[in-house]
Amino acid sequence: MKIAQINTVCGNGSVGRITVDIYHALKKSGHDGKIYYGRRTAPDSVTTEKIGSNLDMGIHVLSTFFTGTHGFNSHAQTKQLIESLKAYDPDLIHMHNIHGFYLDVEELFAYLKTCGKPVVWTLHDCWSFTGHCAYFDYVACDKWKTGCEKCPQFRNSYPYALFKDGSKVNYARKKAAFQGVKGLTIVTPSKWLGDLVKESYLQEYPVKVIPNGIDLDKFVPQKTKKRDKHLILGVANVWDRRKGLEYFKELHGMLDPEKYEIAVVGVNKKQIKELPQGMIGIEHTQNVEELMELYSQASVFANPTLEDNFPTTNLEALACGTPVVTFATGGSVESIDETCGRIVPQKDVKALYKAVTELCENVEQMRGACRERALLYNKYNRFGEYLDLYEESIHHYNNL
């Protein structure tokens, strides 16, 4: 098989790493692959092609910022991608994030409707079926089910627009572009997101759930020095409003400082200065060993997220033997059961406090069950599911 993958980035961030991992799984199984990406740099070990330049991306950002439209610029860059796809001639095209200021989605989908190739599209958020937002739980909006307009967060949620709410036009254009692709299969990492797709204008397509996985040879329980206090850990790539940093601050004020301490990883310098006294802030780290040590030292991993698909941080904590407590948000609940964590109502800090303190008292009895739960999410099994899906899709398409 020859598989072309398309994503905003390659080797960076969770989705960028997934594309690279799938590429290596293909090569290991004797297949061929190529990754097309729009931003940053890519690992030397991967066959790639960058679409456009930083200047092109900047123009797209400004267009979104001033006109409220997103995904309808970058015409020349999209033509470059299409010509390269024609030359590479893959057996299947696998798209991940097609937002991110690097593609004209109308032009890309016009090609997909005529190229004679099966398509797999993995959705990592909700952008594909809304007029603006990547997530809408925070504002409890369901306009995407019938038609977006008067977006309540076009100014303060990605992709940011300053002057104009383009959600009504964006919704109509995306709906027209994304419907009617022969042989397209949608993949979601969570059942939660898959169920949303079935309520959206993408409901014509089959949906397969393939959860994110992690490297269980890398994330393993570590022997660490016993701490004087129970450590409650939080980890995020970016601590924006939906990740729940404010709830950690509230929780900190409720916990006995003689028995508990909180550490949050991924905060910036400004956020560190704003943390309450005694709360530990650690800047973003890509060091797996450092993360493993923190996960293993923690008595509880807390994830008070307000919008999420299927966070791999939950899996990383479980793999290191640490129970997880999460708000009942999106797909964050799907990796947790009573043997390895707790699920509490959104924004309920009293329930969060109760769950955290209860788990701290029972953590040593739960560590084995946490690791067992993580074994369900071995990333190599997940990539095997993708390779099986590729073969099924190609076979099915050739027999349509």
Stretches with model-predicted labels:
Residues 306:
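Aromatic "clamp/platform" in nucleotide-sugar-dependent glycosyltransferases that forms part
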Residues 323-326:
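Short hydrophobic beta-strand element within catalytic cores of glycosyltransferases
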Residues 364-399:
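A charged, aromatic-enriched C-terminal amphipathic alpha-helix characteristic of glycosyltransferases
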Residues 187, 225-243, 249-252:
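Conserved donor-binding/catalytic core segment of Leloir-type glycosyltransferases
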Residues 338, 342-349, 357-363:
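Conserved acidic donor-binding segment of nucleotide-sugar-dependent glycosyltransferases
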Residues 192, 213:
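Carbohydrate-associated surface elements
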Residues 266-289:
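Nucleotide-activated donor-binding/catalytic signature segment of Leloir-type glycosyltransferases, i.e.
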Residues 293-298, 386:
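Short alpha-helical donor nucleotide-sugar binding micro-motif in glycosyltransferases
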